[in-house]
Amino acid sequence: MRLCIQKGFTLIKLMIAVVIVGVLAAVALPAYQDDMMRATVSEAIVAVGPCKTRITKTIQSAPPGTLIPNNGWGCGETVDSNSVSIVNPSKYVSRVTTTASDPGGNGGTIFIYFRLTDSVLANLMIAMAPCDAAVTRFEDCKQPAYGAKVISWVCGGVNTTRRNKWLPSSCRESTYFR
Protein backbone atom coordinates (compact mmCIF):
# COMPACT_ATOMS: atom_id res chain seq x y z
CA MET A 1 0.00 0.00 0.00
CA ARG A 2 1.22 3.35 -0.93
CA LEU A 3 1.04 6.32 1.46
CA CYS A 4 0.03 9.67 0.08
CA ILE A 5 1.85 12.60 1.67
CA GLN A 6 -0.24 15.72 1.75
CA LYS A 7 1.50 18.95 0.83
CA GLY A 8 0.46 22.53 1.64
CA PHE A 9 -2.08 23.89 4.09
CA THR A 10 -5.17 22.09 5.09
CA LEU A 11 -8.45 23.92 5.50
CA ILE A 12 -8.21 23.67 9.30
CA LYS A 13 -4.78 25.32 9.37
CA LEU A 14 -6.06 28.12 7.18
CA MET A 15 -9.09 28.68 9.42
CA ILE A 16 -6.88 28.82 12.52
CA ALA A 17 -4.63 31.40 10.85
CA VAL A 18 -7.66 33.56 9.95
CA VAL A 19 -8.92 33.42 13.55
CA ILE A 20 -5.51 34.43 14.92
CA VAL A 21 -5.28 37.37 12.51
CA GLY A 22 -8.82 38.42 13.45
CA VAL A 23 -8.02 38.42 17.18
CA LEU A 24 -4.85 40.43 16.61
CA ALA A 25 -6.76 42.97 14.52
CA ALA A 26 -9.48 43.28 17.16
CA VAL A 27 -6.85 44.17 19.76
CA ALA A 28 -4.65 46.39 17.58
CA LEU A 29 -7.25 48.60 15.85
CA PRO A 30 -8.68 50.32 18.97
CA ALA A 31 -5.16 51.02 20.23
CA TYR A 32 -4.23 52.46 16.84
CA GLN A 33 -7.33 54.67 16.81
CA ASP A 34 -6.49 56.04 20.28
CA ASP A 35 -2.96 56.80 19.10
CA MET A 36 -4.33 58.63 16.06
CA MET A 37 -6.65 60.73 18.27
CA ARG A 38 -3.76 61.61 20.59
CA ALA A 39 -1.64 62.62 17.61
CA THR A 40 -4.46 64.80 16.24
CA VAL A 41 -4.96 66.59 19.57
CA SER A 42 -1.20 67.03 20.03
CA GLU A 43 -0.90 68.54 16.55
CA ALA A 44 -3.61 71.06 17.40
CA ILE A 45 -1.83 72.05 20.61
CA VAL A 46 1.46 72.44 18.76
CA ALA A 47 -0.30 74.53 16.08
CA VAL A 48 -1.18 77.21 18.64
CA GLY A 49 2.42 77.46 19.87
CA PRO A 50 2.95 80.79 18.07
CA CYS A 51 -0.21 82.13 19.74
CA LYS A 52 1.14 81.14 23.17
CA THR A 53 4.39 82.90 22.34
CA ARG A 54 2.59 86.07 21.23
CA ILE A 55 0.45 86.18 24.39
CA THR A 56 3.50 85.54 26.58
CA LYS A 57 5.47 88.36 24.91
CA THR A 58 2.50 90.73 25.17
CA ILE A 59 2.03 90.04 28.88
CA GLN A 60 5.72 90.50 29.58
CA SER A 61 6.08 93.72 27.58
CA ALA A 62 2.71 95.54 27.79
CA PRO A 63 2.44 98.53 30.14
CA PRO A 64 0.17 98.17 33.20
CA GLY A 65 -3.47 98.93 32.52
CA THR A 66 -3.41 97.70 28.93
CA LEU A 67 -6.78 96.42 27.77
CA ILE A 68 -6.89 93.73 25.12
CA PRO A 69 -10.33 92.77 23.73
CA ASN A 70 -11.59 89.27 23.01
CA ASN A 71 -9.62 87.87 20.08
CA GLY A 72 -7.27 90.85 20.24
CA TRP A 73 -3.99 89.07 20.91
CA GLY A 74 -3.15 88.74 17.20
CA CYS A 75 -3.36 84.98 17.04
CA GLY A 76 -5.29 84.72 13.79
CA GLU A 77 -8.66 84.83 15.50
CA THR A 78 -10.17 87.10 12.86
CA VAL A 79 -13.45 85.54 11.86
CA ASP A 80 -15.71 86.02 8.87
CA SER A 81 -19.48 86.61 9.02
CA ASN A 82 -20.08 82.91 9.77
CA SER A 83 -17.82 83.00 12.86
CA VAL A 84 -15.31 80.77 11.11
CA SER A 85 -11.64 81.56 11.51
CA ILE A 86 -10.10 82.94 8.35
CA VAL A 87 -6.68 81.72 9.43
CA ASN A 88 -6.67 77.95 10.03
CA PRO A 89 -3.61 76.96 12.04
CA SER A 90 -3.87 73.27 11.10
CA LYS A 91 -6.02 70.85 9.18
CA TYR A 92 -7.62 69.65 12.43
CA VAL A 93 -8.43 73.07 13.94
CA SER A 94 -11.41 75.07 12.70
CA ARG A 95 -10.69 78.18 14.74
CA VAL A 96 -8.77 79.64 17.63
CA THR A 97 -10.19 82.29 19.95
CA THR A 98 -8.75 84.18 22.90
CA THR A 99 -10.33 85.91 25.88
CA ALA A 100 -10.03 89.61 26.67
CA SER A 101 -7.55 90.96 29.17
CA ASP A 102 -8.41 93.44 31.88
CA PRO A 103 -6.43 95.65 34.27
CA GLY A 104 -6.82 93.00 36.97
CA GLY A 105 -4.68 90.64 34.94
CA ASN A 106 -7.28 88.15 33.78
CA GLY A 107 -7.66 86.74 30.31
CA GLY A 108 -5.41 85.51 27.56
CA THR A 109 -7.03 82.07 27.55
CA ILE A 110 -6.77 80.31 24.19
CA PHE A 111 -9.65 78.13 22.98
CA ILE A 112 -8.95 75.56 20.25
CA TYR A 113 -11.98 74.31 18.30
CA PHE A 114 -11.63 71.12 16.28
CA ARG A 115 -12.68 70.88 12.64
CA LEU A 116 -13.52 67.18 12.62
CA THR A 117 -17.28 66.86 12.22
CA ASP A 118 -17.34 63.13 11.50
CA SER A 119 -15.04 62.13 14.31
CA VAL A 120 -15.28 61.45 17.99
CA LEU A 121 -13.28 64.67 18.40
CA ALA A 122 -16.11 66.73 16.91
CA ASN A 123 -17.05 69.65 19.15
CA LEU A 124 -14.03 69.07 21.37
CA MET A 125 -12.49 72.29 22.65
CA ILE A 126 -9.20 72.68 24.44
CA ALA A 127 -8.41 75.66 26.64
CA MET A 128 -4.91 76.95 27.44
CA ALA A 129 -4.21 79.77 29.89
CA PRO A 130 -1.06 81.66 30.96
CA CYS A 131 -0.35 81.48 34.69
CA ASP A 132 1.73 83.50 37.14
CA ALA A 133 2.72 80.36 39.07
CA ALA A 134 3.59 76.75 38.33
CA VAL A 135 0.09 75.27 38.51
CA THR A 136 -1.71 72.42 36.76
CA ARG A 137 -5.38 73.39 37.25
CA PHE A 138 -7.43 76.25 35.82
CA GLU A 139 -8.85 77.01 39.26
CA ASP A 140 -5.33 77.88 40.49
CA CYS A 141 -4.26 79.83 37.40
CA LYS A 142 -4.19 83.63 37.25
CA GLN A 143 -2.84 85.63 34.31
CA PRO A 144 0.39 87.37 35.27
CA ALA A 145 0.34 91.13 35.64
CA TYR A 146 1.70 93.06 32.67
CA GLY A 147 5.47 93.26 32.84
CA ALA A 148 5.72 90.00 34.83
CA LYS A 149 6.79 86.60 33.57
CA VAL A 150 4.46 83.83 32.44
CA ILE A 151 5.58 80.96 34.65
CA SER A 152 3.45 78.18 33.17
CA TRP A 153 0.58 77.38 30.83
CA VAL A 154 -2.26 75.20 32.00
CA CYS A 155 -4.40 73.31 29.52
CA GLY A 156 -7.32 70.93 29.47
CA GLY A 157 -10.58 69.98 27.81
CA VAL A 158 -13.51 72.38 27.96
CA ASN A 159 -16.72 71.28 29.73
CA THR A 160 -15.82 67.62 29.44
CA THR A 161 -13.83 64.90 31.08
CA ARG A 162 -15.10 62.27 28.65
CA ARG A 163 -12.29 62.61 26.11
CA ASN A 164 -9.40 63.51 28.38
CA LYS A 165 -7.62 60.27 27.48
CA TRP A 166 -6.67 61.83 24.14
CA LEU A 167 -5.13 64.94 25.68
CA PRO A 168 -1.39 65.05 26.32
CA SER A 169 -0.53 64.07 29.89
CA SER A 170 0.17 67.70 30.81
CA CYS A 171 -3.44 68.59 29.88
CA ARG A 172 -5.33 65.76 31.55
CA GLU A 173 -5.34 67.09 35.10
CA SER A 174 -7.60 70.07 34.54
CA THR A 175 -10.96 70.73 32.90
CA TYR A 176 -12.07 74.24 32.00
CA PHE A 177 -15.75 74.73 32.83
CA ARG A 178 -17.45 77.86 31.56
Language model features by range: what are they?
Residues 1-51:
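N-terminal single-pass transmembrane signal-anchor helix
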Residues 13-22, 54-57, 114, 120, ...:
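Generic hydrophobic/packing signal
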Residues 34-66, 72-80:
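Membrane-proximal N-terminal amphipathic helix
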Residues 60-178:
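Periplasmic/extracellular, small/polar-rich flexible segments of pilin-like filament-forming proteins
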